[in-house]
């Protein structure tokens, strides 16, 4: 699958998309989440306002220096059509005309202009130039060109020289990056503070800091966008003895509906006006009055591990790149987003990452590539990279990492936005991702990810015109001498098989005679050929010598057969000796004599005399086969010798022989004893896992190989499906002499190898690309190539993953009928680790590095190790090679794990393309036509990849849930009240001192009583120790040094001691103390209660001492969400108890304004006390207030109105009817 998303409709097609934008805005805004920007286009035609047209001549323009010029599409006012115009930016004026040679140019003054993108997704790369007199909607060919124009227009505004900069100028100038959008709730302009126009609040929003503005106000907005460097912070920087610290960066207004103040935990924000503040980094929200009370140092929020703080970018290198201070960055994250991926969803993710992180660490791959970002991070010892895109985007970044040699410094994660996303599936990040609101959770998972190594492979190519392979059907007898050689090979293989396996004496004698004649003719033909083609007498003599040895071995075989014909037949009971002889012969011919003597000692002499004859025949047959091999090897050396020039090139291809003998077919299907009684092949690496249930008699033992992952055998030479096995055996018929002679011993891929003397040598090759996922040649590459071509021609048809998969299905179905590469085995030759692989009839070959192919298919057919192959893995330096028979197989493999098409597991792959025409090839979804020549796949390096660790995430989540259940709600809420080193006011210090004295008195009385009552010590020891430890933290000699964090800890512990002591003395089963001790403890307990009640008058301590009194108390975590009436009774009784304690002094009818204000405090609505006091609302008036009265008082929030009405209703129930 292609890695990057498709290019979207060209600007010429944008008119249709923009025409319906006005109708789409309202519906989209209604469906958008609260507080979120709509993703629909804001394409607007120029307003009907009158303007004075200013023109200039080409001569006047020529005198000015051009900053940027080129063709753009301009939207006209008539039906929003697009017309091509030529634009020139010179000075602070933009000129445009029909073409560059026009004499008259329209001009637009940019003195008070602002620039904004046209929409959230911005599929057509359009942008708007907004001036006080007009709006100009323009459209670029691609996103990079659009951003270049926007940057140049902004540089005019700041009077800075425009450059195709290393970084966008707005990232370092504080300028906002506008785009047009609509909103689902009332939104206010941060410039004029008025609401944005329209039902859906049309306006401009900064893509980084979400600063809102009218289109007319954007030009007056201050350059206070999100900070990127230390210089951009300015006077807000915090300096202390440890150096500089990161301050909060506050943005006013437009808070979400659920906003709560981090200081007082009350709701903040408003839909009626621009009020309250939000930090752009830690996302903390506070009231205007509480902002100064909040800790000034910003903790950077949920994503702090991934963020590079602006204070860390404090200097510049000589080459213009920012230098980071490493002490501020533990494991920073570098983000690359392909803005074209996922139907232009990448634009949305690009903006969201800039809002979460430092904008200087987020880069668009479509605007400059990955080089700039990697240069910024290259001096970090360790950093992480997140690539948001498809497999092509990942490959692009990995290739740039290779160029800068950063493999050891960085780990790379993937967020799947492309079509196939095979690598993301394997790494555990899924096959697709569309929800940009969940990015904080993704960053959190990325911080917990583990690292694995990914093998990367170089695709080396060497273009060379090679003669086409021979035809499938042999030519007429007089066509070539190769035809006669094929006849000899068939005859020798057939008659050797009959001699060794036949039980009929007449058949053996007849085959021996025919074999004798065939070998003699073969020797004569070889000698005749070499006499004609070779001028080197030494070489000719060597070949002649080998031929004489062949004749000698043939005579010895015939002599053994003649002797055997006079002996008695072998008894059936001696057949195991022949099988054992086969096992002995698999070792070496030299050891055959010793084994023969050893076997002879284990049996009786008569039996030995009868068994020697078959063993001798087998020995002679092997000797004859060895002699034939030596003739062929000698001929091969001659053909490889550069000093020898034969008349015709050697044909090393394996031809399809339709006249295969019945005997050879029988041998190809047989897995039994016939296959084991054979001759030896050329040396080959042993493979213990490759056994197929019989002796490996076809290999000579090599050096011992350690059973480790690094020393795995280089080739697995077995397959499973008998059908493919038979096809391979058939394909060998008509091949080289060695293959013919070994046909009786064939295993599926056990033909004689053409060993590459140096498998890793790539001299003369050029690196075409690097493979991370998979390589394909033939059918699948042709489908990928056609899809890529169609996407380039009609990008509007390939905008989503679903459409892309449908197109792949259509193209695959077409190939099911066309079968364009049904004879691919005739055009290519496959070698694995230097071993020549004879191919069956197929349409394609796939080489897999990861167990995911073409959008999630496990094309290898399994993930576990079996008796034949090792488990596939992307970190074992081993490739999996599979055959592609047709497109139906590719479709079926998506739902069924097929295994019959496996070919081999190896460390290098070599594919030779014959003929004059190229063959389609694809790597990781990127396809091209490869000219004839050689393709070599060799290991390049390994990359560190971040894989999702679901087991660790599950364990950590269970632990966090347990901590939440154990700690309870008050402890969970304490993080909102960490005020660090803020000193207390004088009144607050005195109140804390009184409370501490009361707590010390209570501890003293408890200790005195515990000397007599041991149970009291057991029950209260923990609370007493915790309270004493908190009180000791406060310095009694210097009470003014108390800080809020110390006061908070004291208050919490004193409250806990009070609760436990009270429950022990006046609980359901009270502890009976002696009279004096009980009285003293009760008096001390009452004093603590009084002091705690005074502490609740301090606003920031009230919600710590009375956390959420209107909610149910903490219970079992599994039942917290249970809203049944059984659990609502408890808080209701609790509220009535508190209410009676504080209002029982007098009836509601006699309440004054102070009692009403206290009642509002009980409802957590103290912000309305001033309104009630100002309108002199007393108890009698309070009982008769209705909804419309509350609205007239200026209470805007519906939830607050409902809470007040519910409280009034409860007051009415508790008040006697006579009083009302």
Curated annotation (Swiss-Prot):
A zinc finger (Phorbol-ester/DAG-type) spans 175-225, 247-298. InterPro entries: ATP-NAD_kinase_N, C1-like_sf, C1_DGKeta_rpt2, DGK, DGKD_4H, Diacylglycerol_kin_accessory, Diacylglycerol_kinase_cat_dom, NAD/diacylglycerol_kinase_sf. It catalyses: a 1,2-diacyl-sn-glycerol + ATP = a 1,2-diacyl-sn-glycero-3-phosphate + ADP + H(+); 1,2-di-(9Z-octadecenoyl)-sn-glycerol + ATP = 1,2-di-(9Z-octadecenoyl)-sn-glycero-3-phosphate + ADP + H(+). Residues 593-604 have a biased composition (Basic and acidic residues). Residues 20-35 have a biased composition (Low complexity). Keywords: ATP-binding, Cell membrane, Cytoplasm, Kinase, Lipid metabolism, Membrane, Metal-binding, Nucleotide-binding, Phosphoprotein, Repeat, Transferase, Zinc, Zinc-finger. Residues 65-158 form the PH domain. It is an enzyme of class 2 (transferase). Residues 328-463 form the DAGKc domain. Gene3D superfamilies: 2.60.200.40, 3.30.60.20, Pleckstrin-homology domain (PH domain)/Phosphotyrosine-binding domain (PTB), Probable inorganic polyphosphate/atp-NAD kinase, domain 1, Transcription Factor, Ets-1. Its main location: cytoplasm. One of its GO terms (cellular component) is actin cytoskeleton. Residues 581-592 have a biased composition (Acidic residues). Phosphorylated. Phosphorylation does not inhibit catalytic activity. A motif (PDZ-binding) lies at residues 1218-1220. Residues 1151-1214 form the SAM domain. Residues 1-60, 581-617, 636-705 are annotated as: Disordered. Pathway: Lipid metabolism; glycerolipid metabolism. GO terms for molecular function: ATP binding; ATP-dependent diacylglycerol kinase activity; identical protein binding; kinase binding; SAM domain binding; zinc ion binding. It is found in: Cytoplasm; Cell membrane. Its EC number is 2.7.1.107. GO terms for biological process: diacylglycerol metabolic process; intracellular signal transduction; lipid phosphorylation; phosphatidic acid biosynthetic process; phosphatidic acid metabolic process; phospholipase C-activating G protein-coupled receptor signaling pathway; phospholipase C/protein kinase C signal transduction; platelet activation. Belongs to the eukaryotic diacylglycerol kinase family. The SAM domain mediates homooligomerization. Diacylglycerol kinase that converts diacylglycerol/DAG into phosphatidic acid/phosphatidate/PA and regulates the respective levels of these two bioactive lipids. Thereby, acts as a central switch between the signaling pathways activated by these second messengers with different cellular targets and opposite effects in numerous biological processes. Plays a key role in promoting cell growth. Activates the Ras/B-Raf/C-Raf/MEK/ERK signaling pathway induced by EGF. Regulates the recruitment of RAF1 and BRAF from cytoplasm to membranes and their heterodimerization. This is Diacylglycerol kinase eta. It comes from Homo sapiens (Human). The gene is DGKH.
């Amino acid at each position: 699958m292609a890695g990057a998303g498709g290019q979207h409709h060209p600007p010429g097609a944008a008119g249709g998309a923009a025409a319906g934008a006005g109708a789409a805005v309202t519906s989209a805004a209604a469906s958008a989440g609260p507080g979120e920007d709509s993703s629909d286009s804001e394409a607007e035609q120029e307003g009907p306002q009158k303007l004075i047209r200013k023109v200039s001549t080409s001569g006047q323009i020529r005198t000015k220096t051009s900053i940027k010029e080129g063709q753009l599409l301009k939207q006209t006012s008539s039906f929003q059509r697009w017309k091509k115009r030529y634009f020139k930016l010179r000075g602070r004026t933009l000129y445009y005309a029909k073409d560059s040679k026009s004499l008259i140019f329209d001009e637009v003054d940019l003195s008070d202009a602002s620039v904004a993108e046209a929409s959230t997704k911005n599929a057509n790369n359009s942008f708007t130039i907004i001036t006080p007199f007009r709006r100009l909607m323009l459209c670029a060919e691609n996103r990079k060109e659009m951003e270049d124009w926007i940057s140049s227009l902004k540089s005019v505004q700041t009077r800075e020289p425009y450059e195709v900069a290393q970084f966008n100028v707005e990232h370092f100038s504080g300028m906002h990056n506008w785009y047009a959008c609509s909103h689902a709730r009332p939104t206010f302009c941060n410039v004029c503070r008025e609401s944005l126009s329209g039902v859906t609040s049309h306006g401009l929003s900064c893509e980084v800091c979400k600063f809102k503005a009218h289109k007319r106000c954007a030009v007056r907005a201050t350059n206070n966008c999100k900070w990127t460097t230390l210089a951009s912070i300015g006077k807000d920087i915090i300096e202390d003895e440890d150096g500089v610290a990161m301050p909060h960066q506050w943005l006013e207004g437009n808070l979400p509906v659920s906003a709560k103040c981090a200081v007082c935990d009350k709701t903040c924000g408003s839909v009626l006006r621009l009020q309250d503040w939000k930090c752009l980094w830690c996302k903390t929200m506070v009231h205007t009055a509480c902002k100064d009370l909040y800790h000034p140092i910003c903790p950077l929020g949920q994503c702090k591990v991934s963020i590079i703080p602006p204070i860390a970018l404090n200097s510049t290198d000589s080459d213009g790149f920012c230098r980071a201070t490493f002490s501020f960055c533990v494991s920073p994250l570098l983000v690359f987003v392909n803005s074209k991926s996922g139907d232009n969803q990448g634009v949305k993710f690009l903006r969201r990452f800039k809002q979460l992180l430092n904008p200087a660490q987020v880069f668009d791959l479509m605007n400059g590539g990955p080089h700039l970002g990697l240069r910024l991070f290259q001096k970090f010892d360790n950093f992480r990279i997140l690539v948001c895109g498809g497999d092509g985007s990942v490959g692009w970044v990995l290739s740039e990492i290779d160029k800068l040699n950063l493999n050891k410094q960085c780990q790379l994660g993937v967020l799947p936005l492309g079509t196939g996303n095979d690598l993301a599936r394997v790494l555990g990040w899924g096959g697709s991702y569309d929800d940009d609101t969940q990015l904080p959770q993704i960053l959190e998972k990325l911080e917990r990810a583990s690292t694995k190594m990914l093998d990367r492979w170089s695709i080396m190519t060497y273009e060379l015109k090679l003669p086409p392979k021979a035809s499938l059907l042999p030519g007429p007898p007089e066509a070539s001498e190769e035809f006669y050689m094929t006849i000899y090979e068939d005859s020798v293989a057939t008659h050797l098989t009959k001699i060794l396996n036949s039980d009929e004496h007449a058949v053996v004698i007849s085959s021996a005679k025919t074999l004798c004649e065939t070998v003699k003719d073969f020797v004569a033909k070889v000698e005749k050929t070499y006499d004609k083609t070779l001028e080197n007498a030494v070489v000719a003599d060597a070949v002649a010598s080998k031929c004489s040895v062949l004749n000698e071995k043939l005579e010895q075989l015939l002599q053994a057969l003649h002797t055997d014909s006079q002996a008695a037949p072998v008894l059936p009971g001696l057949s195991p000796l022949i099988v054992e002889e086969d096992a002995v012969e698999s070792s070496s011919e030299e050891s055959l004599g010793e084994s023969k003597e050893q076997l002879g000692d284990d049996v009786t002499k008569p039996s030995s005399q009868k068994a020697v004859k078959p063993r001798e025949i087998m020995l002679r047959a092997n000797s004859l086969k060895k002699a034939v091999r030596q003739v062929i090897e000698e001929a091969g050396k001659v053909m490889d010798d550069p000093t020898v020039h034969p008349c015709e090139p050697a044909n090393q291809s394996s031809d399809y022989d339709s006249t295969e003998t019945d005997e050879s077919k029988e041998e190809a299907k047989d897995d039994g004893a016939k296959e084991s009684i054979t001759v030896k092949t050329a040396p080959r690496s042993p493979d213990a896992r490759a056994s197929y249930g019989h002796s490996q008699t076809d290999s000579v033992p090599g050096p011992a190989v350690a059973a480790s992952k690094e020393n795995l055998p280089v080739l697995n030479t077995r397959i499973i499906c008998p059908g493919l096995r038979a096809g391979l055996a058939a394909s060998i018929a008509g091949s080289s002499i060695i293959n013919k002679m070994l046909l009786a011993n064939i295993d599926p891929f056990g033909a004689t190898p053409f060993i590459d003397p140096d498998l890793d040598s790539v001299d003369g090759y050029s690196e075409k690309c690097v493979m991370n996922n998979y390589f394909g040649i033939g059918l699948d590459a042709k489908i990928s190539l056609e899809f890529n071509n169609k996407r380039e021609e009609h990008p509007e048809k390939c905008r989503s993953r679903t459409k892309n998969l449908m197109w792949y299905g259509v193209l695959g179905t077409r190939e099911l009928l066309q079968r364009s590469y049904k004879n691919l085995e005739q055009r290519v030759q496959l070698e694995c680790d230097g071993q020549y692989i004879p191919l069956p009839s197929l349409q394609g070959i796939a080489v897999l590095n990861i167990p995911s192919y073409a959008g999630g298919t496990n094309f290898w057919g399994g993930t576990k190790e079996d008796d034949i192959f090792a488990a596939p893995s992307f970190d074992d330096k081993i490739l999996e090679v599979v055959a592609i028979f047709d497109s139906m197989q590719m479709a079926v493999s998506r739902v069924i794990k097929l295994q019959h098409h496996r070919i081999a597991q190896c460390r290098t792959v070599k594919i030779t393309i014959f003929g004059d025409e190229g063959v389609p090839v694809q790597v990781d979804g990127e396809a091209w036509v490869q000219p004839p020549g050689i393709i070599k796949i060799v290991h390049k390096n390994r990359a560190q990849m971040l894989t999702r660790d679901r087991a660790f995430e599950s364990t950590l989540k269970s632990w966090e849930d347990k901590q939440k259940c154990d700690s309870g709600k008050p402890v969970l809420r304490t993080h909102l009240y960490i005020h660090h080193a803020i000193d207390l006011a004088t009144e607050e210090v005195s109140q804390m001192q009184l409370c501490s004295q009361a707590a010390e008195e209570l501890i003293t009385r408890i200790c005195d009583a515990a000397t007599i009552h041991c149970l009291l010590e057991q029950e209260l020891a923990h609370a007493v120790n915790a309270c004493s430890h908190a009180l000791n933290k406060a310095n009694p000699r210097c009470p003014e040094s108390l800080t809020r964090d110390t006061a908070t800890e004291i208050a919490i512990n004193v409250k806990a001691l009070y609760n436990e002591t009270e429950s022990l003395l006046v609980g359901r089963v009270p502890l009976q103390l002696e009279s004096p001790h009980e009285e003293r403890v009760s008096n001390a307990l009452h004093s603590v209660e009084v002091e705690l009640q005074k502490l609740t008058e301090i606003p920031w301590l009230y919600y710590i001492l009375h956390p959420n009194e209107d909610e149910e108390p903490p219970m079992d975590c599994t039942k917290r969400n249970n809203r049944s009436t059984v659990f609502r009774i408890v808080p209701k009784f609790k509220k009535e108890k508190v209410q009676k304690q504080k209002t029982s002094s007098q009836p509601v009818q006699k309440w004054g304004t102070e009692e009403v204000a206290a009642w509002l405090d009980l409802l957590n609505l103290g912000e309305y006390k001033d309104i009630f006091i100002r309108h002199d609302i007393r108890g009698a008036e309070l009982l008769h207030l209705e909804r419309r009265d509350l609205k007239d008082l200026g209470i805007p929030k519906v939830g607050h109105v409902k809470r007040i009405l519910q409280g009034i209703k409860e007051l009415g129930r508790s008040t006697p009817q006579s009083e009302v």
